[in-house]
Each structure stands twice: as structure tokens, then as C-alpha cells.
UniProtKB/Swiss-Prot annotation:
Predominant cellular place of this UniProt entry's protein: cytoplasm
UniProt pathway annotation: Membrane lipid metabolism; glycerophospholipid metabolism
Annotated sn-glycerol 3-phosphate binding sites: 105, 133, 188, 241, 251-253
Active site residues according to the UniProt entry: 188
Protein's recorded name: Glycerol-3-phosphate dehydrogenase [NAD(P)+]
Subcellular location per the Swiss-Prot or TrEMBL entry: Cytoplasm
GO biological process: carbohydrate metabolic process; glycerol-3-phosphate biosynthetic process; glycerol-3-phosphate catabolic process; glycerophospholipid metabolic process; phospholipid biosynthetic process
Length: 330
């Protein structure tokens, strides 16, 4: 079986290692020839996973022509690159039988769509699955225990993809609810930023836990509005991923929120950070107008948007959010 992964960052490489440990040969696509040479010759990916040796059966390429004939193609690019990646696959003549996986987190930046809908725009006949879970890429690469949720509408796809990943160290669950998992993947980075700010501003762990709980409510509300009839928050990829992202200070979005919480305005920190690397910044910009349009009380989204995109004072935005949540629960 030929399996390709597009995106040789930390998470894409970690996914490749999970498959390689189950003796599947994996082709890892990266745009940079030097990166390809490092993976193929040294079996390392030092920029993203230092001190990790990659299995020899992982091979890298910088040519789309090398992967379009693969039976399974998993996309692990930043969310704002998914549409271009799908278009590229179509232009290179990908088979209608190829199974497309999405492991990217976030929403489409051009049309504010779920990433699964972007795939349908160009590859409507291809089977599709979403893969996510509460995993830090470095721990997965080390071979530590982890859990994954495989979401697909077709039962056969769910079963087959789950079987590829399952091992004594990898717990897999399956669901047909592809909507809630994608919504949670977008929301969780925003919630993590606010959680990081909460701790930096010394509101305490109680407040942080309350914000995470509110975040779950907002995920459910948005998922229903997006078409999920019965949002399943119990999956590893929903509540599990949210807990990990919000509580692990090594998580990129939580760390960003904590650093941001040392200041009063985003502009005080923005010169020292690359917003393209913080998915929560991009997600807040996309989700804010959608939640307003859908008339949803997503107070965490409104707070994050105010801070990150509307010049809001951080402490004032947090206080406003807490008051609105408090008022709503009465």
C-alpha cells in the first residue's frame, strides 16, 4: 500500500512515524529539496523533531508527481495551504479512488469553510477522512502512548484507516461526525490562547477550567450550526485535544497566550512573533464573522478577536468575556 503525507513538519513527520512503525512505507512530501535530502540521507528532521531518528522506510520527495499515484494521501499543511494543496493534487491527476486524509487544524481561509468541504470542491468523488487527537508531535515521534480519532462518513474508510494506525501504543477511535472534529480543531487553538492569557494574568486554574468548559459549549453550538446533528465531544479529537492544547505550556498556542498575557495589547508582542505559526490567530479572524452571522454567543471567540484583530486591551477583553459568560449562566 502506498501512503503519502503532504507536510513534513513535526505533526506530519510524527504521523509518518506511526505508520512506519506498523511497517507501512510512507512518502513524505516537502517543498524544499534540502529538507528532502536530510530525511533521505540522514533520516532526521532536525528543524521540527530534533534528536529523533526516522525509520528508513520513510522516504521524502519534493515532487507531487511522486505521490499522486498513492492510495492514501494525508494532508498535514497549515490550514491556509490546504486549498492550494488540493488543487495541486487535482491538477496532477490524482485518482478518484485515492483516499484523502486531513490532519491540518483550522478552517479554509478563502471561503471560511470546513477543510472537508474544500476537498469536496475539487475532489468530490474521493473518499475522505479526518484524523486528529490529543497529541504532542514530539511525544508521538518518541513512541510514547497516544490516541487518535478517525472520522469518516463511510464506515469502511473509518475501519481501514483506524487499522493502519492501531498498535499497542496507539489507541484509535472512530466516528462519522466529521463536522465536530473539524470545528474543535479550529476552536481549540483560540481557547488555548485565552487559557494562556488567563494563567499569565493570574486568574487562576479554576478560571482556566471554567473557560475550557465554556469552550466546549461553544464548540457544540457551532458544530450544530454547521450541520452536526449530535455533536460528539467525548472523542479524543475533541475534549482530549482541547485539554492537552490548553494545559500543555509547550503547546504553541497556549505558550503564545501566556506570553501575550504579559502585556496589555497584542501589538506589544506582535513584533516578536510570527502570526502564521499560531493557528489560533488565523482561526479567530475566520470564526468571528461566522459566529456573528450565525447569531451564536461564542464569547471566547469574541474576546480573542477583540484582542488579536481589533486592538482591544487584553485585561478589558478578558473581564468583558467573564461578565458575559456569568450573565448568560444566570
Amino acid at each position: 500500500m502506498k501512503i503519502a503525507i503532504i507536510g513534513a513538519g513535526a505533526w506530519g513527520t510524527a504521523i509518518a512515524m506511526l505508520l512506519a512503525r506498523n511497517n507501512y512505507r510512507v512518502t513524505l512530501y516537502t517543498r524544499h529539496s534540502a529538507h528532502t535530502q536530510e530525511i533521505n540521507q540522514l533520516h532526521t528532521n532536525k528543524k521540527y523533531l530534533p534528536n529523533i531518528i526516522l525509520p528508513n522506510i520513510i522516504k521524502a520527495t519534493s515532487s507531487f508527481s511522486d505521490i499522486v499515484d498513492h492510495e492514501i494521501i494525508i494532508i498535514v499543511t497549515p490550514s491556509d495551504q490546504v486549498r492550494a494543496t488540493i488543487k495541486n493534487l487535482k491538477q496532477h491527476g490524482i485518482s478518484n479512488n485515492a483516499i484523502i486524509g486531513i490532519a491540518s487544524k483550522g478552517l479554509d481561509h478563502n471561503q471560511s469553510k470546513l477543510l472537508s468541504d474544500v476537498v469536496k470542491d475539487y475532489l468530490a468523488n474521493n473518499p475522505l477522512f479526518i484524523i486528529a487527537g490529543p497529541n504532542l508531535a514530539n511525544e508521538v515521534a518518541q513512541g510514547l502512548p497516544c490516541a487518535l480519532t478517525i472520522a469518516a462518513i463511510q464506515k469502511e474508510v473509518r475501519f481501514n484507516i483506524s487499522t493502519l494506525f492501531h498498535s499497542p501504543n496507539v489507541i484509535t477511535s472512530t466516528t462519522e461526525d466529521i463536522i465536530t472534529i473539524q470545528v474543535a480543531s479550529a476552536f481549540k487553538n483560540i481557547i488555548a490562547i485565552i487559557a494562556g492569557i488567563i494563567i499569565a494574568k493570574q486568574y487562576g486554574q479554576n478560571c482556566k477550567a471554567s473557560i475550557i468548559t465554556q469552550g466546549i459549549k461553544e464548540i457544540v453550538a457551532f458544530a450544530r450550526a454547521a450541520g452536526s446533528t449530535n455533536p460528539d465531544i467525548s472523542e479524543f479529537a475533541v475534549i482530549g485535544d482541547l485539554i492537552l492544547t490548553s494545559y500543555a505550556i509547550t503547546s504553541r498556542n497556549t505558550k503564545f497566550g501566556y506570553d501575550l498575557g504579559q502585556y496589555e495589547y497584542y501589538t506589544d508582542l506582535s513584533n516578536n512573533t510570527n502570526p502564521n505559526l499560531i493557528e489560533g490567530i488565523k482561526a479567530a479572524k475566520i470564526l468571528y464573522p461566522l459566529t456573528v452571522k450565525l447569531n451564536l454567543n461564542c464569547h471566547i471567540i469574541y474576546c480573542a478577536y477583540s484582542i488579536l484583530h481589533n486592538g482591544g486591551k487584553i485585561s478589558s477583553a478578558i473581564e468583558c468575556m467573564l461578565k458575559k459568560i456569568n450573565h448568560e449562566t444566570k
